[in-house]
Amino acid sequence: MTELSKAEKVLKEFIIQMNQWELKYYPLFRNEGMTAYKDAAKKELDDIYDLFCTKKERKQGRQISLSCGEPPEYSPDEEVLSSELNKNKCVFITQQYTEAKNKFRYTLQFKEDEWRIDKKERFSFYDDKWIKYNL
């Protein structure tokens, strides 16, 4: 398996697990409120991030807000449009087919013999550039 294939496998598995997390917690939050499930949702989300993402403090984003929706932002149908490998960094551009049909750019880093997702960006057609987007 090539390094590019290994990195893509990490990205796809992350997307699948995030999709499952959203599918599980969105109805619970909507129907019963966040308070009852906040701790369990945070733990499961932290476990996903610990498994797939670079180890760094994320002061904003899903780990803080526990945001999820219907349809889920993450979908197994998200298509990889292009990929690029450069030494210890791999970049994937994907197309979302749910919600706003965004284009995303994921950057993965190779550290300690494994690929980890470091950041996510969304292409802004209005600004005609990639902008930071929370994982």
UniProtKB/Swiss-Prot annotation:
Organism: Dickeya dadantii (strain 3937)
Disulfide-bonded cysteines: none
Effect of loss of the gene: A double rhsA-rhsIA deletion is outcompeted by wild-type cells, restoration of rhsIA restores normal growth in competition experiments. Restoration of growth requires the RhsA-specific immunity protein, rhsIB does not restore growth.
Function: Immunity component of a toxin-immunity protein module, which functions as a cellular contact-dependent growth inhibition (CDI) system. Specifically inhibits its cognate toxin RhsA. Cell contact is necessary for growth inhibition.
One Pfam family, short name: Imm-NTF2
Disordered: region residues: 58-77
Name of the protein in its database record: Immunity protein RhsIA
InterPro entries: Imm-NTF2
